[in-house]
């Protein structure tokens, strides 16, 4: 009886396995082997070389030819099958167990994708209600006007966003990811509930209207915007919190969590589809805003319609916020995190200033920041001009809010359609083309909107035949511009931006998202507001500065496209490196041995034996 032998290299298989197959009993056939109830599955685990290190001698009771016996051994798997035993160890079952699928998608993947889609639905439902409500609150309040918005974005929203980023960076170094998520989102839920049920009903008592009137009489009407911030400070705080909900909860909390639990392949397939549920929420939330706008109109003169509607809408916001927390808890409880390749360079914890210096020194993060800032400035240059026309066309708060509800619904429908097409764009053309579509759409539609404003006179007869005034036509064209730009942002720009974070190391990913999404997003909006303020002071009015705003828009979109092209090359390089690391890890985890040279038949080297026994007809 030959003993077990130790081998190294590549496994040498029998040159003619047919003879062995004849010796097997019917119960040892392929069908019985594959469908045996107690047969564990094959595993290519890291200890796989131990399974193949030893070769078992031929079982007693089996007659073999002299040629077969001259080999002196058969592999352990063959011997076990011939003897009716188990081929593999008991610990190998889990690795190759086939995961069940629904509609072609693994259940483990659906356990991540479905809750993430529901979370995005709830977050965007809240954001639409908050976004449509904040403008009506601050613009239609007593002693305020649309002039307050640029001052709010520049002098209130941006400082609070920077302060939040600094606090978030500190908390990210001391709190776990779960604790950080709850620590950030719970204050939003509490505030919006308190605003609807406490702060707004007491607004007449907590707003310093008498002091604001005295200061306005002393300083003059040109300071009406800054003084309005003090006059209606609780409404302005609501405005800022609504803005932060979009940048913090959507960009930092949700997308950071999604990047944490999804792989790159899952992201390419499902990130564009996350927005499907979100834009269904956009459609329904738009209808919700429209419903409450009509309800305010029908309540009668003696009832404060805003108080009634705010209580209802803030109750919905709080309920959706609690649902977000539950979904986050459920995913962390029942969904395993994907394993990622470890980065060779482990970055230590950094302070706030060190984090900012690191982010500024990274070309990758700078290009990402350029994308976010460029979008914020570009959309702001067009949107504020459009809102000034919208205010002139719909001066009533009820009409203004109702139009915004219709606008949100149309945006949801357009974005839903774009989401269906976006997966094809990513699959067919890749990340780079998808990242460049949004600036191209914004540029083309922006040119159309500004052209109608600047050259509206010649189009007046044609517009009159359509039953519209030039002002109403500008409102509708501006609405279309915003709808197409926002749908391109939600379906292509946001997924592209979030995919760009995935190949980064954990430290850059967390602090980079905080700096870009919380600071750069408001910086883009505030930058657009500063440009408009400068133009108004220089040329006397927003209308007089419109041609120059168009030129600025062209320059910013050009820089946006250049940054997208630069980021495309860096992203592809990082993805190639990460894929190479995964391949190397997989290759190093499996070691399959071969027959040692001393046991090879006389006159044959190990390499010759391996070559001779390698199957060629597979």
Curated annotation (Swiss-Prot):
Its main location: plastid. It is found in: Plastid, Chloroplast membrane. The modification N-acetylalanine is found at residue 77. Residues 1-76 form a transit peptide. Keywords: Acetylation, ATP-binding, Chloroplast, Membrane, Nucleotide-binding, Plastid, Transit peptide, Transmembrane, Transmembrane helix, Transport. InterPro entries: ADP_ATP_car_bac_type. GO terms for molecular function: ATP binding; ATP:ADP antiporter activity. Residues 603-618 have a biased composition (Polar residues). The chain crosses the membrane at residues 110-130, 148-168, 179-199, 237-257, 270-289, 312-332, 368-388, 401-421, 441-461, 464-484, 542-562. It is a multi-pass membrane protein. GO terms for cellular component: chloroplast; chloroplast envelope; chloroplast membrane; cytoplasm; plastid. Residues 586-618 are annotated as: Disordered. NCBIfam families: AAA (TIGR00769). Belongs to the ADP/ATP translocase tlc (TC 2.A.12.2) family. This is ADP,ATP carrier protein 2, chloroplastic. It comes from Arabidopsis thaliana (Mouse-ear cress). The lineage of its organism: Eukaryota, Viridiplantae, Streptophyta, Embryophyta, Tracheophyta. The gene is AATP2.
